[in-house]
Amino acid sequence: MWKGDENANGGHCLVNWQTVTRPKDMGGLGVPDLERFGRALRLRWLWQEWVDESKSWSGSELPCTDDDRLLFNSSIIISLGDGAKTKFWHHGWLDDQAPKYLAPNLFRLLSRTNRTVQQELRNNNWMHKLARKITSPIHIEEFMSLWIRIQDVHLQQGIQDTITWRWTNDGNYSTRSAYRIQFRGSLLHFGTDLIWKAHVENRCKIFAWILVQDKILTAQNLQKRGGPHQQQCVMCNGPLETSLHLCLICPFAKAVWNQILTWENFTQIQQQQNANPTHIKSWWEDVAAKAPRAERRRLNGVAIYTFWHIWKERNRRIFDNRSETVPQVAARIKEDIEQRKRAFDYI
């Protein structure tokens, strides 16, 4: 959409789409992933198939993929009753695991795998089907392992099988939990509350989110992309512009920070400002950790506005060929902070 072409992959994107679609508390921007969201909705059919047989479509073939069923089966805890609903091979009813994963080589020998636990345990039907097909030591090993586990299973006639959803406190399915679980394992490299709970506009939050990932189009990042760029920092005529240099190390940026931190009375943060930070993320987390808990949201808002206006000043110098002094940039930051306070009536 932004590129204007039918396909815009790779270097056209500041942040990859997989990161953008993560929930905010998992390091993403919270833009819905339609594929994952669609899967979460389809899982609702599988849930309803278990818990509500009165649905008009109950018993019909559901438009769910193998991946949908795999996610669903790993998301439920089955409590066996009479075994009439639970699939012997596909559901995780045996020590919380599905027999097809406990005995994968045996599973490959079978042609009919959709029978229920009740059907297969009756008269040990599952054993009779496999007895004539076992041909190797691995088959025997898996057969014996499965047989030993099944000895502890006792069906309860007249009591239906029930399921519990793993990802909610009340054990019931929710679309939100089904969506979020698909992002489990995403690595979080930054305390996202520092951005998303700050008292600043969304455009500034999104900029800060891009900044902490070192994806804003500084001279260094433009150089990596093969684009035109300044060879020196336009703020101080120093080294090649990086996110870290522009926002924290550049003498111009340091002077702006000193004015803002003095004005906001963050004296303990000014000492941190004199250190040599190695990354914006680690610097930000360190100064937030040193601030009193009651002051952290305000500090985060001040930090984002400062980053934002340093970036805007950099762009003025490059694209508009005009510049402002340190006091002028600091005044813009103070004005935004004061307007935000008045708009939301907080101090």
Functional labels for PLM-detected ranges:
Residues 1-347:
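A helix-boundary/hinge signal
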